[in-house]
């Protein structure tokens, strides 16, 4: 057996991709055992540090923001460590000539660097022994610390190997120019660098391939504008022994920094795998490669040869040609007739099931609405109040797609009429909102329900009219009057009181799921009234958390809710925390690419918290109240949902009757762990090939 066949071909495959797999890849996956792979998205199993954040729709990871504000560096790591070194005892049994055996590895990723308007330092693929350390900006790409003694102490036990995609010339760091690729082996001073053959700052997707062959002690890097055609010749080829830097387990991921520039560093697609451990009891058993072949169509290292087996029995003599033709004819005829019969059954069955589904949904809606009691006003009254639902009376659109009209009832009361179509998701939103409002009828900080009605094609909710619009418009309308601090503080306190009521005091717990400034209405006295319960869910006290498709508005959604779809009171608390920071700072959750959470937390770490106050207030606020709102906001957006306070505690902290919760100087990393299930990946010691795919 050739020596190459004695190596284990594949230990670990990690794939993060935002594009559909090819048909060939899909068929190979389908043939693999169900337990040998799982699919994840960018929103799962990642640790985000510094300025790193998920792109809308979890379409990738932004490592930096296109601004000079904030941390300036970001890092995204796969949360589960990867085995890269065989321990000494196992290595000794496999090969007496070496104390430890490193793995070979390869990775492919598609990235995009967009100047805004200037470029930053660049980004890097890295392997690191620390999941929580984030290095410096200003040329260091978030990989290594600056030269301060405190940072050096923090780095003492951290091992890092990185491939730089460098877009900034820093003479002090021995950079050759402002457009190069380089290898860092334990230090920011690169051991090798080269021209990439592409313009790294072009703002277009670029694909990089990195491959390290441990037996040859060589690392190669290719770059191309094409995501599928790897160049024949590598841009960088470095002879380097990484065994002294690799640890038994390390974390794979990306890091970037902006330094004195401002650019958006995005990774859109990522594949990673290790291979090359000698066959031993400590390494996983050989398995088939179940992912797509490498884009350059280079074969993977072959698996070990199978053990000899007895020869198969001699085949029977071939049939006569006429028999073969007749047999083939019957096969084709049977296949055609069988296909036609099957198609007919599918069409008939689909029609029957569709009819049943429609009838069942209509029946379910009728039952749901009937359970809520009789309508409190007629559809004719609702139509008359809005002048026949005249488009000139439209004042907004609800998050569930319902249209909101201003109207006047026969009594002269001004109302907001929310009109749903009696189809699909609109019906569900109507039922959810009506059920929530009937379960929590009385609270001064909820928009009061004045009535409701239904017909065959329309569903209507009627609320008291809020003459001062919503909090979003009051905060962010250009050229308008600045909302004074007294009204802002009262709004934050009012929304906190409303959420505490929904979570703890209603007959059933109500999870709002869409707390944001545009859903906070302002009455005639600028009192805050929380509204729009179209996404709300009702759960009995002590009942299990809700698992749903994540819904709401990006920027306000808790990271664990985006990842798991499990809606709890703590996900509402996170949304409230973002709202509190928005009200105090006058900034939207994400403005010009800057997260208000990251920005305020950075100022808190620099002991400049009150500097986050909205400049339009011109200092006209109570400093203690401003500080209290900002700190309450930060503790509510803690990445670990278990460390967020309940809304009752939030109310007490805001009114000063409870002490503030201690907030760490640095924002803790966002640890997005997978939901445990039977198909979760086994430990690294015993896992077969693992396949990860993001769609």
UniProtKB/Swiss-Prot annotation:
Catalytic activity: L-seryl-[protein] + ATP = O-phospho-L-seryl-[protein] + ADP + H(+); L-threonyl-[protein] + ATP = O-phospho-L-threonyl-[protein] + ADP + H(+)
Residue ranges of domain Protein kinase in the record: 389-661
Disordered: annotated segments: 286-323
Transmembrane region(s): 332-352
GO-annotated biological processes: pollen aperture formation; pollen development; protein autophosphorylation
Signal peptide annotation: 1-23
Entry's EC annotation: 2.7.11.1
Tissue specificity field: Expressed in roots, leaves, lemma, palea, pistil and anthers.
Topological category with respect to the lipid bilayer: Single-pass type I membrane protein
The organism's place on the tree of life at top rank: Eukaryota
Compositional bias annotation for Pro residues: 286-320
Keywords associated with the record: ATP-binding, Cell membrane, Cytoplasm, Glycoprotein, Kinase, Lectin, Membrane, Nucleotide-binding, Phosphoprotein, Serine/threonine-protein kinase, Signal, Transferase, Transmembrane, Transmembrane helix
Annotated GO MF terms: ATP binding; carbohydrate binding; kinase activity; protein serine/threonine kinase activity
Residues with Phosphothreonine modification: 376, 386, 403, 657
Annotated compartments: Cell membrane; Cytoplasm, Cytosol
Known role: Legume-lectin receptor-like kinase required for normal pollen development and male fertility. Regulates pollen exine assembly and aperture development. Plays a critical role in annulus formation, and may participate in the formation of the fibrillar-granular layer underneath the operculum. May function by regulating the expression of genes involved in pollen exine development. Kinase activity is required for its function in pollen development.
Similarity-based family: In the N-terminal section; belongs to the leguminous lectin family.
Protein name stated in the entry: L-type lectin-domain containing receptor kinase S.7
Species name: Oryza sativa subsp. japonica (Rice)
């Amino acid at each position: 057996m050739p020596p190459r066949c004695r190596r284990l071909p594949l230990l670990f495959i990690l794939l993060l991709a935002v594009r559909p797999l090819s048909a060939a890849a899909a068929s190979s996956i389908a043939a693999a055992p169900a337990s040998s792979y799982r699919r994840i998205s960018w929103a799962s199993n990642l640790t985000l540090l510094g300025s790193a954040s998920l792109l809308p729709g979890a379409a990738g990871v932004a490592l930096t923001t296109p601004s000079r504000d904030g941390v300036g560096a970001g890092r995204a790591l796969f949360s589960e460590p990867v085995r890269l070194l065989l321990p000494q005892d196992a290595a000794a049994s496999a090969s007496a000539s070496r104390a430890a055996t490193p793995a070979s590895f390869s990775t492919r990723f598609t990235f995009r660097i967009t100047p805004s308007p200037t470029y930053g330092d660049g980004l890097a693929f890295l392997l690191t022994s620390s999941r929580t350390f984030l290095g410096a900006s200003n040329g260091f790409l978030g990989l290594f610390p600056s030269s301060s003694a405190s940072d050096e102490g923090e780095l003492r036990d951290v091992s890092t190997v990185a491939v730089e995609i460098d877009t900034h010339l820093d003479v002090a760091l021995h950079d050759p120019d402002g457009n190069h690729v380089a290898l860092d082996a334990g230090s920011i001073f690169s051991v090798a660098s080269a021209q990439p053959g592409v313009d790294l700052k072009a703002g277009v997707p670029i694909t990089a391939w990195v491959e390290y062959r441990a037996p040859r002690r060589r690392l190669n890097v290719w770059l191309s504008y094409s995501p599928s055609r790897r160049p024949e010749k590598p841009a960088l080829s470095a002879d380097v022994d990484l065994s002294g830097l690799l640890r038994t387990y390390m974390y794979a991921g990306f890091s970037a920094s902006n330094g004195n520039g401002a650019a958006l560093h995005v990774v859109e697609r990522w594949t990673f795998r290790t291979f090359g451990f000698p066959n031993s009891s400590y390494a996983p058993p050989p398995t088939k490669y179940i992912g797509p072949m490498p884009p350059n169509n280079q074969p993977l290292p072959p698996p070990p040869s199978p053990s000899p087996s007895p020869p198969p029995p001699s085949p029977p003599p071939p049939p006569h040609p006429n028999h073969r033709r007749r047999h083939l004819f019957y096969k084709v005829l049977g296949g055609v007739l069988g296909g036609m019969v099957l198609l007919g059954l599918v069409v008939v069955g689909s029609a029957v099931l569709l009819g049943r589904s429609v009838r069942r949904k209509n029946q379910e809606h009728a039952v749901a609405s009937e359970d809520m009691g009789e309508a409190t006003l007629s559809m004719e009254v609702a139509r008359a109040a809005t002048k026949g639902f005249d488009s000139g009376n439209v004042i907004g659109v609800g998050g569930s797609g319902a249209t909101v009209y201003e109207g006047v009832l026969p009594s002269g009361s001004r109302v907001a009429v929310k009109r749903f179509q009696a189809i699909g998701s609109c019906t569900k939103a109507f039922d959810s909102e009506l059920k929530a409002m009937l379960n929590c009828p009385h609270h001064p900080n909820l928009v009061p329900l004045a009535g409701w009605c239904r017909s065959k094609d329309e569903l209507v909710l009627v609320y008291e009219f809020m003459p001062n619009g919503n909090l979003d418009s009051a905060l962010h309308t250009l050229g308008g009057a600045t909302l004074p601090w007294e009204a802002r503080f009262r709004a934050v306190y009012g929304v906190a009181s409303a959420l505490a009521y929904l979570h703890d005091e209603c007959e059933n717990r109500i999870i709002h799921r869409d707390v944001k400034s545009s859903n906070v209405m302002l009455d005639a006295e600028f009192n805050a009234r929380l509204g729009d319960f179209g996404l709300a869910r009702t759960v009995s006290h002590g009942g299990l958390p809700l698992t749903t498709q994540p819904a709401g508005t990006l920027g306000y959604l808790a990271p664990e809710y985006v990842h798991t779809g499990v809606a709890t009171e703590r996900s509402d608390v996170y949304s409230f925390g973002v709202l509190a920071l928005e009200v105090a700072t006058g900034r939207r959750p994400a403005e010009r690419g800057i997260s208000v959470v990251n920005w305020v937390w950075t100022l808190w770490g620099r002991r400049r918290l009150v500097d986050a106050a909205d400049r339009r207030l011109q200092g006209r606020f109570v400093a203690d109240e401003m500080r209290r709102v900002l700190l309450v906001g930060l503790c509510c957006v803690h990445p670990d949902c278990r460390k967020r306070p309940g809304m009752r505690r939030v109310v007490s902290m805001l009114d000063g009757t409870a002490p503030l919760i201690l907030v760490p100087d640095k924002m803790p990393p966002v640890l997005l762990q997978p939901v445990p299930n039977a198909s979760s990946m086994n430990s690294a010691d015993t896992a077969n090939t693992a396949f990860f795919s993001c769609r």
